[in-house]
Amino acid sequence: KQAAYDYLYSDVALKKRLIWLNKLFSDCGLKDYEQLLGLLKENSKLIRRNIEKIILDKEKKTRNLLEQLYPELDEDSQNWTRQLFKYWDNAHASASKIKFRNKQAVIDYCSKHIELYCTQQIAWLPQKPYTRIHWANETDVDEFVPRHVLRYVLSEHMALTQITRLHACDAIVPFVDEKEWQAALEELFRYWLADSAEANRRMLLLPYCFYGAEWQIAQLAPLIKSWSKASRKQLVGLTMKLLGLKASPNALIILNDWMETAPNGMYKRAAWEAFRQAAIRKGLSIEELADQIIPDFGFNRQGEKRVDYGTRTFRVTLMPDFSISVLDLDKQKVSKSLPAPLKSDDREKAENARAEQASLKKRVKTQTNIQKKRLEQSLKNGRTWPKEAWLATFIENPVMRYIATGLIWGVYKEGKLQDSFRYLEDGTFTTADEKEFLLPDNAVISLVHPIDLPDETLADWKEQLDDYELIPFIPQLSAPVHRLTETEKQGDTLLRYSGKKVYLSNIYEFETADITTRIENNTLHIIDRSLNVVAQLSFVYEESDCFLKELYFSSVEEGEDINTIQLPKEERLPLSSIPERFISTLLDILNRAFPLNE
């Protein structure tokens, strides 16, 4: 061990020492932190950065050592140490309870705690945007928030090396006029963007996201897209983490969009993790949170909203095909879009309404595409909703209400279908033989999969949809069915494909939009995060040929993804514990990926 430490302090190149540092204290888990922290005397930013990653969650084991070492450090390392102490202090439960009685208490606190090192991090920002901001609810138009208060808030965020909410700043900001503060943040943000959004100054995104208005959060969406196209991965990743911490409706909608539609797997995973953390903080599952943020675009349950031009009023209706119908309430004239404003109209109201409608079609299309993917996932994994949650998601929301009418739903108990029904536009429910259905108060509801329906009932549902010329939102009733044999249901391993010859290229190209895969040790690992299950399909080479072996399922930990999951999993879940519809869907994917039925 001593030889290892001697090498760490030797004259070898910095790059090799960093590799060795991480090997000893991360990979090998050595805990001689005095040896690690001694490297801080060398005043290397890279060394500090690597040490921070190692000790960030080890305050109890390292803080006393750092306090003793502090007087021996140079200025840069001392500044770094103070910032680390602040991060730890901010994480303590007591920090979240900080409150200020009045604005004088805010002024005194900022005067006491503002630091030169931190203010140096905002020296590049213009001061004018935040020099004439009033206190919240201030009646004296000549009394402004002292500049050092806002400099404190900005500088504390800009000096951070880790992303976190600063409780003291969160307690200060409510004392400041919200609209003026947000306008100042917008001006500072635009100043940074005009300077090519320099990565070294990216921490300005923290106060912008944390304290920005919903319209400011919404305008981050096109920026994230442009940054991703320009391969500015650092900015995209940071912004997604901040949106997860913000967790406002627009922030979560942006993350959900990227979770479902991101072309890049890295960005998709970043959005998913930020969204997952937001869900955890709210005490919800990812899917429950995704349900809650489905936008209604300002429409009521019937898909209607009123638009005011000042002198004229219009009723805008979202139609079942997601087109728009506009009724002039004065003339009783119907059109497909809002008219241009007249001289007698309030021009600002009219132009804002027209601008919103112009983007509505695209936003509705994006949202319906996202919901299509989510419903396809639910059909596959058998996700269920309690009655009240189902009504709130599919009936109260006008977009989802139109979607729900062409789908067949089921009441389930212990995973078994009890009754199937369809929602009608008049608000009632019907059965396959067109009898009225009453939804039980304690109903647990899921999309019906054909594997759960008797052949006669399945045929009745198909006939009913045809008779009413309803086109299902997803191909629900035509989903392929691959049933397990009674013998297979009793075991934990599927051997039906054992010995099947497949092309190696098919294995390495195996991937679907909602399933992530990894190939390791001659095993194809297929991970489904919705069920926290990994399917493991092993194969073997015999000369130039490749043959499948066995397929079995294992559970994965909450939050594990394709990068962090520890494979292989030795545990084998009973096939009877896996939703039959999920196995059926997976077998269909395998049948399409490989010519297994030939």
Segments the model singles out, each with a brief description of its role:
Residues 1-247, 252, 259-598:
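Non-catalytic terminal/accessory regions
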